[in-house]
Structures are given as structure tokens and as C-alpha cells.
């Protein structure tokens, strides 16, 4: 079984040997060393294979971002499909050097056990805005299908701030008001990282250096929240999955104010950290945000050949 597993992994990794754009490995780690780490798995340990015959597979689909764009909701909804096996945690393989340096063998161990017919999906929102990641993923599998969920850039900035704020509050640490982070000397603080993460055009250009647009499906995060079923149908078609998810899998929870999931008669909602109210922001500051993102948004629309209902 170990030999069969290794053969499958090497088949996925094979493009590394012939492609003209090799990955940018961590310091001191060469491309062949990455392959070697896949080849050398412990003998007779059963690693990568369960007693029921299921195996761990490298992902055929990755949700690459964007942070605070709705990636968790997308993964949970996609997991309703019986032919999808999703990694439970964010792996951060391609963007964290301490993980990437351990090679594809380590990455494989982070994947869920799945049947041969299932599609393995991994989600790490930081991938979209990490410069090295597109080339590294392409080196692993140039035909992989990528999912990118985006929302209104200004709203994404506010959600980004809200998450960090709550993280600080839980640790009883102070955190400045959003106005102090967004503004500097009467102007937008362009060094604020949350702003950069919402410049979708710049990040998308980097991905299109390595993947054709047809390999990247953009999910409208705002529509996914308002009416999830049509957006998930598009994802099913993009991934060439049979249409198994239906409208009855979603119901609107009036208490929470957003859609929850119904799977095999069991209801479940996203974690309470999802859908938090954003802080009150001066309308003039919001106008500055909308103005700042206006031109980058137009460039993004032209780049991907579609528009979104953003400010």
C-alpha cells in the first residue's frame, strides 16, 4: 500500500521535474530534496493509509483566500458534498517556511483520509496575498483547481480589523481604534496591512503569472452570505462535482442573521466568531476607503472579465 501511495504522490509531483518555472523552496532546500521528502516515508507504519482502505491525498483543490472573505463558510458549505474531503485546519504549507521546508511528505500528512473518488480540499486564506505561493503550488500541481472567495474590499478591511480586535480583547490586550490604524497625518495609512490585502488586482496578477484564469474560480463572498445555494452550484460545476448540494441544505437563522447548514437532518451554524458586527466608522472615513479602492477595483474587474457589486 505504501508503494501505491508513493506512486500517486510522485505522479502529482512529476511536473516539478520538467516545468520551466520551478518552485522557490525555503533556504537551502533544493527541488530534488522536496521530492525526496515525499519518497522517504516510514516503512511498514501504514502512514497515509487507514484500515478501511482510505488514503491521504495531496489536495486537488485549494481555497487560496482571501482572508476575511468567507473562506470558512465556503469550506463548510462545500463539505456538504459527499465527494469532498476537507482538511480541518489551515495548513499554511506554501506560505510558512518552517512548513514548506519539510516537503510534500509532511504536507500529505496534514490531509484528511479520503476515498479514491473524493476530492481533497485545503483552505489557507493567507495564500492569496503571499508572493511565493502561486509558484510553489504550480510546482506541486500545475493543473490544480483554485477557489478564491472575495468580498467588498472596504468591508473586508473592517472585518480584518474586527478579527484582530477581538483576538486582542480575548487576551486582555489593548488595541487601537480603527481610525488610528487607517489614518496617518490626515491621509489613509497605506502601510496598514489590511488595506494591502484588499488590493485584489495586484495579488491576482501574481497568480495569473502561473495559472490561467480558467483554473481560478472566484466566489462572490457577498452573494454567498445573502444567497448561498447559487454560488455553491457554480463551485460544484467548476470542480466537476455531481450536483449533490441543494437548497434544502441551507436555512436562514433569524437569531444569528445569516444562513446555517442542514446536513443529514442535523443543523449547524458557523462559529460564533463569524458574522461579528463591525465597529462604527465615520462615514467620511468610509468614503476615503471607497475612493481608495475604486480604481484598483476597476482594474480587477477588467483583469478577470466580470464585475462585482462593490462600493
Curated annotation (Swiss-Prot):
Keyword list, A-Z = Disulfide bond, Glycoprotein, Golgi apparatus, Signal, Transferase
How changing residue 95 to A/N affects the protein?
Answer: Abolishes the enzymatic activity
Leader sequence residues: 1-20
Result for mutant: residue 89 to A/D: Decreases the enzymatic activity
Enzyme group, top EC level?
transferase
Q: Which cysteines are joined by disulfide bonds?
A: 260-269
What molecular functions are annotated in GO for this chain?
Answer: [heparan sulfate]-glucosamine 3-sulfotransferase activity
Compartment(s)? Golgi apparatus lumen
Q: Where does 3'-phosphoadenylyl sulfate bind?
A: 68-72, 151, 159, 259, 274-278
UniProt effect for mutating residue 67 to E/A: Abolishes the enzymatic activity
Under catalytic activity, the entry for this protein gives: alpha-D-glucosaminyl-[heparan sulfate](n) + 3'-phosphoadenylyl sulfate = 3-sulfo-alpha-D-glucosaminyl-[heparan sulfate](n) + adenosine 3',5'-bisphosphate + H(+)
Do you know which Gene3D superfamilies this protein is assigned to? P-loop containing nucleotide triphosphate hydrolases
Effect on the protein of changing residue 123 to A: Abolishes the enzymatic activity
Per the UniProt annotation, where are the glycans attached? Answer: 52, 196, 246, 253
Q: Name one GO biological process term.
A: heparan sulfate proteoglycan biosynthetic process
**Membership in a protein family:** Belongs to the sulfotransferase 1 family.
Q: What does this protein do?
A: Sulfotransferase that utilizes 3'-phospho-5'-adenylyl sulfate (PAPS) to catalyze the transfer of a sulfo group to position 3 of glucosamine residues in heparan. Catalyzes the rate limiting step in the biosynthesis of heparan sulfate (HSact). This modification is a crucial step in the biosynthesis of anticoagulant heparan sulfate as it completes the structure of the antithrombin pentasaccharide binding site.
Listed PANTHER family:
HEPARAN SULFATE GLUCOSAMINE 3-O-SULFOTRANSFERASE 1 (PTHR10605:SF16), HEPARAN SULFATE SULFOTRANSFERASE (PTHR10605)
Under which name does UniProt file this protein? Heparan sulfate glucosamine 3-O-sulfotransferase 1
Q: Which gene encodes it?
A: Hs3st1
